[in-house]
Amino acid sequence: MISLRFQPSTTAGVLSASVSRAGFIKRCGSTKPGRVGRFVTMATAASPLEICVKASITTPNKLGDCPFCQKVLLTMEEKNVPYDMKMVDLSNKPEWFLKISPEGKVPVVKFDEKWVPDSDVITQALEEKYPEPPLATPPEKASVGSKIFSTFVGFLKSKDSGDGTEQVLLDELTTFNDYIKDNGPFINGEKISAADLSLAPKLYHMKIALGHYKNWSVPDSLPFVKSYMENVFSRESFTNTRAETEDVIAGWRPKVMG
């Protein structure tokens, strides 16, 4: 198990084992060009939340390809909540993990000494405990784009080019394109919200998996879908928490080949 500690507000983190390292925290990876790295001491940082996430199956010590884990991490990043990320090999789940997550599922987050599963429950708890900045999506907008993921999976798994699954996906994307055209740039207008943080990782998987396995991409006739994806994928919170392309491809392989 690898533990990575992050302080989103300072873009800083530390690689650790079972014992936390004192001193400075620095996010793993390179700093952006022209940007000076900033550091905070452990003593002045807020106590990080512990979160168990899927580990990469292609690269040691990297975040894996779970879109639901990324949804929670995006929420923490956007709210500047520091977190201690524990990467779990889901193909060989350790005993300590099964004790806190008997079903063996990720993500799970520790709130007040209690481990909480389910990305929807976790993000709601984060909204209640860390209300600023507010990320809740109004109920009437919360389901926008919610059918895209299932239709993407249906098309990805399809082995019959004439079964209509591609058109079903295109219909959902067209509906979303028209919505963003009239209401964007995000689902709740000018500011990103929980619905975007849920949808963005799924669109990322759609882009990579369909590009690799179907040689398919969002058509130019849906410019607002494409601009939406560019907007969310380019956010620092997203680049900090996205899976490697190779992991997304490997993660979907069993569903495609099965």
From Swiss-Prot:
Q: What gene codes for this chain?
A: DHAR3
**Which protein is depicted?**
Glutathione S-transferase DHAR3, chloroplastic
Query: Family assignment?
Result: Belongs to the GST superfamily. DHAR family.
Q: Which reaction equations make up its catalytic activity?
A: RX + glutathione = an S-substituted glutathione + a halide anion + H(+); L-dehydroascorbate + 2 glutathione = glutathione disulfide + L-ascorbate
Question: How is the protein altered post-translationally, as described in the entry?
Answer: Partial S-glutathionylation and intramolecular disulfide bond formation between Cys-66 and Cys-69 in the presence of oxidized glutathione (GSSG). Could be reduced by TRX-dependent process.
Q: Where is the active site?
A: 66 (nucleophile)
Q: What are the disulfide bonds?
A: 66-69
The UniProt keywords, alphabetically, are: Chloroplast, Detoxification, Disulfide bond, Glutathionylation, Oxidoreductase, Plastid, Transferase, Transit peptide
Q: Does the keyword Transit peptide apply?
A: yes
Quaternary assembly: Monomer. Interacts with TRX3.
**EC no.?**
2.5.1.18, 1.8.5.1
Q: Enumerate the residues binding glutathione.
A: 54, 65, 93, 106, 119, 205, 252
Quote the InterPro entries the UniProt record gives. DHAR1/2/3/4, Glutathione-S-Trfase_C_sf, Glutathione_S-Trfase, Glutathione_S-Trfase_N, Thioredoxin-like_sf
Q: Where is the GST N-terminal domain?
A: 56-129
